[in-house]
Curated annotation (Swiss-Prot):
Pfam family, one: Ni_insertion
Domain of life (superkingdom): Bacteria
Protein name: Putative nickel insertion protein
Protein family: Belongs to the LarC family.
Keywords (A to Z) from UniProt: Nickel
InterPro entries, sorted: Ni_insertion
GO MF annotation list: lyase activity; nickel cation binding
Family matches, as Gene3D superfamilies: mk0293 like domain, Transcriptional regulatory protein pf0864 domain like
Length: 392
């Protein structure tokens, strides 16, 4: 059965608050440490800790990243490559890369440069990388399929950054907040950080009132500061959707009769990197007996506008049709299991809470095949033996 999370952002949202709230829902800190170790970051460049604290007499979990590597500037391309080259599971990599992609797009627009030329300052630091990748790791551990958030407080005043003193919300944050519900019913201070806004921009299907759901757990993550008006806490409600509630999935498609296979393959890569759930091509017959291709992609409703714009800019399409669809999905989670090649991540699928099947993660098998010079299908066969798949 699918799980959803609703973030109650009454005080705002940041990267560390998000990770803290998800850890408070039951993600083990050791699991987060082990998964982050799959990134090619020096093990001694940071340390993680959690502790219980209070914000205006309300208990919450505080997540701290002590940074020992003081380098704060990294290019978007370097960070994206770092995540892409890691042995993290596919869903974790996709979510983390989608968040950084939204950040890069916002920074590029604000500073008038190409996305590939974006250099992150505060967001390029190790703690921000940990916050973003850590969010993706925790969501995957909890088996979360959908994410929503309450309307966001804008905040006011000014914030000190590497670019100097900037108004609140910071320009990149303001860009990321486009299309989201916001309000001004809060005191001064930065309530929504660029990282927090990027997490919602990339992953949330809606920023609105709490959806109908059966709540199974509540996590509370504390921010670094105390505000005079409200407890600086992010609450995360984990549960199951009620009744026939849609998870906001859409199918978008367009017909193309004058493109090359190379270009279409490139567009598929761009769509998947930008957060599309699936992309596929269907051969079709078009007017004047022209053979063509129907390009289709599946996405959350919050990403439709951006993905459609990508297709319209990168292809000869002059329009895109889209419609909502319902899905029946299996519950899933990731688990590391011992194999003859060492520990590898497996995707576990469940039906009505009962184990259905397990499969090794493709990228991990691909890495083993390349490193050891073994055919990929042989690696998959070996690690798919019953004693491994059943966890024996």
């Amino acid at each position: 059965m699918k799980h959803i999370i609703h973030f109650d952002c009454f005080a705002g949202i940041s990267g560390d608050m998000t990770v803290a709230a998800l850890l408070d829902l039951g993600v083990p800190l050791e699991h987060l440490r082990d998964e982050l170790a799959r990134l090619d970051l020096p093990r001694d460049s940071y340390s993680l800790s959690i502790h219980r604290t209070e914000r205006r007499h309300l208990a919450a979990l505080r997540f701290d990243v002590q940074v020992l590597d003081q380098r704060t500037e990294r290019g978007y391309a370097a960070i994206d490559g770092l995540i892409a080259a890691s042995s993290l599971s596919g869903p974790v990599r996709e979510r983390a890369r989608a968040i950084f992609r939204r950040l890069a797009e916002a920074e590029a627009l604000v500073h008038g440069v190409a996305v590939g030329e974006v250099h992150f300052h505060e967001v390029g630091a190790v703690d921000s990388i940990v916050d973003i990748v850590g969010t993706a790791i925790c969501l995957d551990y909890l088996g979360v399929d959908g994410l929503s958030a309450a309307p966001l407080p804008l905040g006011s005043g000014f914030v000190h950054t590497a670019h100097g003193v900037l108004p609140v919300p910071a320009p990149a944050t303001a860009e990321l907040l486009k299309g989201m519900a916001v309000h001004g019913e809060c005191g001064p201070g930065e309530r929504v950080t660029p990282t927090g806004a990027a997490i919602l921009a990339a992953l949330a299907t809606s920023v609105t009132a709490q959806p109908a759901m059966t709540v199974t757990a509540v996590g509370s993550g504390a921010g670094s500061r105390d505000f005079p008006d409200v407890p600086n806490i992010l609450r995360a409600f984990l549960g199951r959707p009620e009744g026939e509630m849609s998870d906001g999935v859409l199918v978008a498609e367009t017909n193309i009769d004058d493109s090359t296979p190379e270009l279409l393959g490139y567009v598929m890569e761009l769509l998947l990197e930008a957060g599309a759930l699936d992309v596929f091509f269907t051969p079709i017959q078009m007017k004047k007996n022209r053979p063509g291709v129907q390009l289709s992609f599946l996405c959350r409703s919050g990403l439709l506008e951006r993905l459609a714009a990508l297709v319209l800019v990168e292809t000869s399409a002059i329009g895109i049709r889209h419609y909502p669809v319902s899905r029946t999905t299996l519950e899933r989670c990731m688990e590391e299991r011992e194999t003859p090649f060492g520990p590898l991540p497996f995707k576990l699928l469940f039906h009505d809470g009962r184990p259905l099947r397990a499969a090794p993660e493709y990228e991990a098998c691909r890495r083993v095949a390349r490193e050891r010079g073994i055919p990929l299908q042989e690696v998959i066969r070996i690690v798919s033996q019953p004693t491994v798949v059943e966890g024996g």
